[in-house]
């Protein structure tokens, strides 16, 4: 068997390097690796990588300043063994240490120009191999900029600038090697540089050109993966922003919940003892997975009708029907006025008639005020109030106009199916009523999706617009049908996300996004999951979703709660078994609640919170 030649060894080295590069997905680490391997192959004291950045502002091809947004070179990475050794006070360089070198990153960008060595390499797609950059022919289009040497206290001599060209012909950057050394262990200074460096020879150039092409493919792949991640993140943020913008009643919610969730998750991961000492996300991808789940936790709200989300009063549909009912009261008052006048014409006692009218007017005023207050849903509407509502509703008024005219097709079909338009006008009707045609039956397409483990009580109707049905709601403004429609957003969130071909590193996004309404009592929705099936990130989402909703100052239907009131309400959720007590305690003791408040709450909301009364006795 023939002995292995130097070129065979170099080829083996390049293949091993190519294999190593192809397995690295992190761009900074990839650039470190490319530089270290290229320098090791050529005994280069220093090296740099410049990456091409395409002009990013596509609007009319102009930048924010109005100038053409041209392609630029980004000084992305640099290594220099001699400068590092000198900074550490060493008089010799360990050749093995090159593998552990970490690049400096300079936030420097400049237009691609043939006047610079690296710019010429990009534009001409050719390698520049220069024995001494300080002795270039002045007639050449490119020249060396010695200002960096003067700034660093260095002396570049031999330099090779190699374009990094991918398979598709694109030049993604330039790999630049500086000062091929006679003895790699030697520390170069401006005084000894020329005596201790060699020019890069032809074999060096061939080798590095081959390596550069492999590196270009790896860089391009890594940049593509990063840009895909960035695009996905941007689309997710766009969707979350669209949901927030869809309704002023949820403005900012989808943006703030992820930030609060990340804050609390970071505190949980930092715990060295206690219930969260073993909690940690595996890596940066796991953190990103959680962040995306948090961003998408309300994505199902794109299917929720705005007027349901925005319903600020019980009788509100696409308009507030309290105005219609007030008109009926006006009719009853007008009837009372007519009755008084008719009584006078019939010879009745004017004083008694006036007294009866004033009593009736006051009664109607009181009744309407009662209904108007009930419509707001601000107070609990108990059975006694429901009984009074039903008594008021029994009053009658006379309708003289056909109520089947001017209806949209769907509503007219419901109306005609239950009450054909054969009534003889005028018609005597109750003041308030629930009519069969005011109920919109649930269709088969609206059935709860199967195969997801959903456990929800589904109302018979999709909507019920009955006046008594709506006014009799005991808490808030939403009927059972509307409450289900709101809660259904989590169902849609899970169905939407589980239908996506998510990569392995994002497989838990549906879990994180779809469990923030589950409880530790096992009675949450949409699956009534037991506590053992709720991960720490899922429990974090539940706390953050509630706290953000309590403290939001941009909701037009309610006054924002103070910090102390919000914490007290959250403690109630803890006491009733809705949220994790350990996380709630960490939320307080880590000061996350206050950090969030200072960043997102109005100054007049932030007051003192006595957290001691909420902490478990030890």
Could you say what each language-model-derived stretch is?
Residues 48-113, 136, 295, 320-328, ...:
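GAF sensory/regulatory domain recognition
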Residues 1-33, 37-41, 62, 206, ...:
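Signal-transmission linkers at sensory-effector interfaces
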Residues 120-127, 174-183, 203-226, 242, ...:
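Signal-transmission/dimerization alpha-helices at domain junctions
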Residues 114-119, 126-127, 131-160, 184-198, ...:
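Signal-transducing coupling segments at domain and membrane junctions
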Residues 15, 24-89, 113-117, 124, ...:
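Helix-loop-beta substructure at the N-terminus of cytosolic sensory domains
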Residues 157-166, 171-176:
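A short, aliphatic-rich beta-strand micro-motif
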Residues 1, 13, 170, 186-220, ...:
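Amphipathic alpha-helical "output/dimerization" segments
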Residues 195, 199-203, 239, 310-339, ...:
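Divalent-cation-assisted or electrostatically stabilized phosphate/pyrophosphate-binding catalytic cores
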């Amino acid at each position: 068997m023939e002995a292995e030649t130097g070129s065979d060894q170099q080829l083996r080295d390049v293949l091993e390097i190519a294999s190593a590069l192809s397995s690295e997905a992190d761009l900074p680490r990839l650039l470190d690796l490319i530089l270290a391997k290229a320098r090791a192959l050529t005994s280069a004291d220093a090296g740099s990588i410049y990456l091409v950045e395409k002009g990013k502002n596509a609007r009319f091809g102009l930048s924010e300043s109005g100038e053409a947004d041209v392609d630029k070179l980004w000084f992305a990475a640099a290594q220099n063994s001699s400068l590092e050794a000198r900074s550490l006070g060493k008089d010799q360089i360990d050749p093995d240490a090159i593998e552990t070198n970490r690049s400096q990153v300079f936030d420097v960008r400049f237009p691609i120009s043939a006047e610079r060595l690296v710019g010429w390499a990009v534009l001409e797609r050719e390698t520049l191999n220069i024995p001494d950059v300080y002795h270039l022919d002045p007639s050449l289009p490119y020249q060396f900029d010695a200002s960096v040497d003067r700034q660093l206290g260095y002396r570049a001599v031999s330099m090779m600038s190699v374009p990094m060209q991918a398979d598709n012909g694109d030049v993604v950057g330039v790999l630049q090697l500086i000062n091929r050394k006679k003895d790699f262990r030697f520390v170069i200074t401006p005084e000894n540089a020329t005596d201790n460096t060699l020019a890069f020879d032809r074999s060096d150039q061939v080798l590095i050109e081959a390596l550069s092409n492999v590196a270009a493919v790896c860089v391009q792949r890594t940049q593509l993966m990063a840009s895909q991640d960035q695009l996905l993140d941007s689309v997710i943020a766009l969707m979350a922003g669209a949901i927030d913008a869809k309704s002023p009643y949820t403005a900012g919610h989808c943006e703030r919940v992820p930030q609060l969730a990340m804050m609390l998750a970071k505190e949980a991961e930092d715990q060295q003892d206690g219930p969260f000492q073993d909690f940690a996300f595996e890596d940066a991808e796991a953190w990103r997975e959680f962040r995306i789940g948090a961003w998408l936790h309300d994505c199902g709200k794109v299917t929720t009708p705005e007027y349901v989300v925005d319903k600020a009063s019980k009788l509100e549909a696409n308009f507030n029907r309290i105005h219609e009912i007030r008109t009926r009261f006006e009719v009853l008052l007008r009837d009372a006025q007519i009755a008084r006048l008719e009584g006078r014409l019939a010879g009745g006692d004017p004083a008694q008639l006036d007294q009866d009218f004033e009593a009736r007017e006051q009664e109607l005023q009181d009744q309407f005020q009662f209904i108007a207050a009930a419509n707001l849903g601000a107070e609990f509407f108990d059975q006694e109030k429901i009984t009074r509502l039903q008594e008021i509703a029994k009053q009658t008024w006379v309708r003289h106009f056909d109520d089947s005219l001017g209806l949209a097709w769907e509503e007219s079909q419901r109306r005609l199916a239950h009450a054909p338009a054969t009534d003889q006008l005028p018609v005597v009707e109750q003041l308030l009523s629930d009519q069969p045609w005011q109920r919109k039956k649930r269709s088969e397409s609206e059935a709860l999706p199967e195969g997801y483990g959903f456990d929800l009580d589904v109302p018979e109707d999709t909507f019920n617009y009955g006046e008594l049905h709506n006014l009799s709601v005991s808490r808030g403004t939403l009927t059972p049908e509307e409450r289900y429609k709101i809660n259904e957003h989590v169902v849609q969130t899970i169905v939407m996300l589980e239908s996506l071909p998510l990569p392995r590193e994002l497989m838990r996004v549906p879990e994180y996004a779809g469990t923030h309404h589950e409880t530790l009592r096992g009675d949450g929705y949409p699956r009534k999951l037991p506590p053992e099936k709720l991960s720490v990130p899922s429990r974090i989402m539940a706390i953050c979703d509630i706290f953000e909703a309590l403290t939001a100052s941009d909701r037009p239907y309610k006054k924002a709660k103070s910090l102390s009131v919000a914490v007290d309400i959250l403690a109630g959720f803890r006491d009733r078994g809705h949220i994790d007590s350990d996380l709630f305690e960490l939320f307080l003791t880590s000061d996350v609640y206050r950090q969030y408040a200072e960043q997102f709450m109005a100054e007049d909301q932030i007051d003192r919170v006595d957290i001691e009364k909420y902490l478990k006795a030890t």
